[in-house]
């Protein structure tokens, strides 16, 4: 029977969801969807001191915002401690793991000797075959009997064949601490196996964990999944992406007015490509994405590319989707008359949703003040008179074309040019010298409102 391809995303809720984490989640999601498989979400919250309910909530909110739907219920490792203990006991009973009674002092002494001899710090296996009376006052840890020689080899979907010499990278590592809590590598293996995870796509910072996990899969008799280790995202300076490069929290991008469609499109291209194509919808990606085509080398974050993609999606997504995202930012475009026309007015120049919000407010609301720099630059006695004459002559124009034809005729009669009038009109109508096409703004506002705003501006200028 052919097993169902199953991937997972398994964040630790000790902080916000980083965009590198979102890219990992996206790769796992797309691979599962392409193959009709399952995409699971597991919260690795065994570190009870550092866990945060707010962080867990933020991870789930980020998934919802991005439209990455996981299958089944969320799995919480903190609810599975009894299960992990069962498997620790199983390995102890089978002689594949053992109690280690090494004291803190013994461990420090061993490390000091190894350091002095310029050896790699490692546990020396002194309790591996211990059968004597356990020393008093020591709460033991549990260690796995790891291979002491030979190679651990696996075929990575991104990096190709990966080899580790057991003696170079491994000692009998701890699977349960002295307080009984399981370690990271142990819980990951138990959960991936029992959840039926067949393919693991994760950052290559986990590469060094893989040989240890393979040792555990083999000791427990579980099938080893296929691994794909993806290179990190770097900043534009070539260093590992961090807060100094800009936003890294997924939900910060939402607050910045970035659309989830743009962010996902941007992230999938940081490490994967399909020909020279730049723009991919989520539906496209579900058909096209292949983790075997992920680049081996690190990708560089490019803020300009994200801005370009965001502008593209603002231009092309339907009104309902743009307004749904605007509502999440506390702004509802649909309350305005001619809302669709207003969006079309603004979307051609907008780079973020805040450009839509600010642009809509500047057009819909009569200006309470005027950009003084723009006034100084573009307004003078001559064009104030021209503006007054323009307002007085406006009559029954309705469409942008009506206003354009009227303006051209008016300027011809006055022997003036559009540059003499366009900026004063913009400033009078919106308070700023930056706006969409003045003819479309005139159409949106209508003759009466335009006259009212121009008259108000002229009064402020002493006319």
Curated annotation (Swiss-Prot):
It catalyses: tRNA(Glu) + L-glutamate + ATP = L-glutamyl-tRNA(Glu) + AMP + diphosphate. A motif ('HIGH' region) lies at residues 11-21. It is found in: Cytoplasm. CDD domains: GluRS_core. ATP binds at residue 243. SUPFAM superfamilies: An anticodon-binding domain of class I aminoacyl-tRNA synthetases (SSF48163), Nucleotidylyl transferase (SSF52374). Its main location: cytoplasm. This is Glutamate--tRNA ligase 2.
